């Protein structure tokens, strides 16, 4: 077990700051929701619609940028430090292009928003919010590229410090622009977009300055010279990153589809489902951080041409994710009523939500396993097949089963519980498939590297 404990330490060392960063991003969104909600119902609704659109698009594009981590991680393990700097400069062109494209989409989102059957008092806030935040997503894309570069070399603490500072700065900026403090215009929910853009710019500049002056990055010479866009690097990023982005989109679309299917059952069901999903998402940050850490750790070891240790790291990731998931499940089951009570005091919503978070507790195990496997597979630069397996698991199994059980069941419709049954079945199928894929990739890499560099007799 000593070899696994060593990898546990490595994953925890890399993963804890990543967890802190993810928590900071989540709290930033929660701050926007709380402050906009106190400005008025329309402001909250407008912000909710705006973030629903922007987050879905952003998570797809951020998946593409996540390709930077395994690319850098493998080069770092191979000690090709100057090539890391060269790759970063070339990938920044890709990130800038994606960021500008996103900004263009959000700035012109009114074409789609105005077609929705939503009150104009809400859509006007949504449109103005998306315009305000549009250039901010460009800054976030550049920040994410630099973040993944840093994390690929195991330097995760600086990203956490900057993300945490950004979260703290977002609070006063929200108050200033939402409520019109200190002579600023009172913008309501739109003010959250202004605050997000300012914070994103400061975070981007902060990480750029830190990387420029910290001795940790000097050996890669990230900004020592100018590099033109590279077609080969662009293809590499898109080949690796597009499946990651599509995989994230497939997963998000399953949750969105579940909400749409349940929407016909009334506001109590929708509200209860939203509470349960939100709780599951918060606990999901633990395996997410471990999975992202594994992408770095496994990538480093593959770069070192050490497939045996990479296999141990990947196995340790799964073990750590299972342990974390079981702890999460115990917490959810033990304190379920209390946690739900923090979200709502309405008795019908509370009662149904309490029953649903029992499913959220079961949800943790397959969700944790799949996140650990996905993270490890990214470290091996294996992203296309996992995306196909994800599509099959969620849209061939989870959604049809969930829809049938919700509306028909076995004699009686199961309602929201049926949808959760379907999602758990789909997740369980994918967790098994992803483990099988990981085992195959690990064995293939051991064979390939042993042929390339046979052990001395």
Segments and roles (model prediction):
Residues 18, 22, 33-34, 51, ...:
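Transmembrane alpha-helix boundary and packing residues in multipass membrane permease domains
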Residues 44-103, 107, 140-154, 158-159, ...:
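Small-residue-rich hydrophobic transmembrane alpha-helices
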Residues 65, 133-151, 159-167, 192-208, ...:
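Short runs within selected transmembrane alpha-helices of multi-pass transporters and secretion channels
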Residues 13-32, 132, 136, 166, ...:
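Transmembrane helical elements of multi-pass membrane transporters/channels
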Residues 27-45, 113-120, 176-187, 249-276, ...:
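Helix-terminus/linker motif at the lipid-water interface of multi-pass membrane proteins
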Residues 3-34, 38-39, 55-67, 71, ...:
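N-terminal transmembrane alpha-helices
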């Amino acid at each position: 077990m000593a070899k696994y404990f060593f990898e546990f330490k490595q994953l925890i060392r890399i993963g804890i700051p990543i967890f802190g960063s993810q928590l900071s991003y989540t709290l930033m969104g929660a701050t926007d929701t709380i402050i906009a909600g106190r400005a008025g119902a329309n402001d909250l609704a407008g912000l909710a619609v705006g973030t629903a659109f922007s987050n879905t698009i952003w998570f797809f594009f951020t998946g593409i940028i996540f390709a930077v981590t395994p690319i850098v991680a493998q080069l770092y393990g191979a000690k090709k430090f100057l090539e890391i700097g060269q790759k970063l400069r070339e990938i920044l062109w890709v990130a800038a292009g994606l960021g500008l494209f996103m900004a263009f989409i959000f700035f012109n989102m009114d074409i789609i928003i105005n077609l929705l059957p939503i009150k104009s008092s809400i859509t006007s806030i949504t449109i103005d919010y998306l315009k305000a935040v549009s250039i901010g997503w460009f800054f976030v894309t550049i920040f994410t590229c630099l973040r993944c570069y840093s994390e690929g070399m195991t330097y995760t603490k600086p990203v956490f410090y900057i993300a945490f500072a950004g979260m703290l700065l977002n609070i006063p900026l929200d108050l200033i622009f939402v409520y019109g403090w200190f002579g600023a215009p009172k913008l309501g929910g739109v003010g959250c977009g202004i605050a997000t853009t300012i914070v994103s710019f400061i975070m981007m500049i902060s990480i750029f300055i830190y990387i420029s002056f910290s001795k940790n990055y000097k050996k890669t010479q990230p900004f020592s010279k100018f590099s033109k866009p590279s077609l080969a690097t662009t293809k590499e990023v898109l080949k690796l990153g597009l499946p990651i982005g599509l995989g994230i989109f497939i997963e998000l679309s399953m949750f969105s589809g579940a909400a749409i299917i349940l929407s016909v059952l009334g506001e109590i069901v929708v509200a209860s489902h939203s509470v349960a999903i939100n709780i599951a998402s918060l606990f999901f940050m633990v395996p997410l951080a471990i999975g992202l850490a594994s992408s770095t750790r496994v990538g480093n070891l593959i770069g070192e041409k050490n497939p045996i240790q990479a296999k141990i790291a990947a196995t340790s990731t799964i073990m750590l994710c299972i342990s974390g998931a079981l702890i999460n499940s115990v917490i959810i089951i033990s304190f379920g009523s209390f946690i739900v009570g923090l979200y709502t005091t309405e008795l019908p919503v509370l009662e149904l939500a309490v029953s649903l978070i029992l499913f959220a507790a079961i949800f943790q195990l397959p969700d944790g396993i799949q996140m650990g496997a996905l993270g490890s597979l990214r470290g091996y630069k294996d992203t296309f097949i996992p995306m196909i397996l994800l599509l099959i698991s969620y849209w061939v199994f989870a959604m049809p089963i969930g829809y049938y059980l919700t509306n028909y069941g076995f004699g009686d419709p199961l309602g929201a519980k049926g949808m959760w049954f379907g999602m758990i079945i789909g997740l369980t199928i994918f967790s098994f498939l992803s483990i099988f894929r990981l085992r195959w990739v690990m064995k293939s890499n051991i064979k390939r590297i042993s042929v390339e560099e046979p052990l001395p007799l």
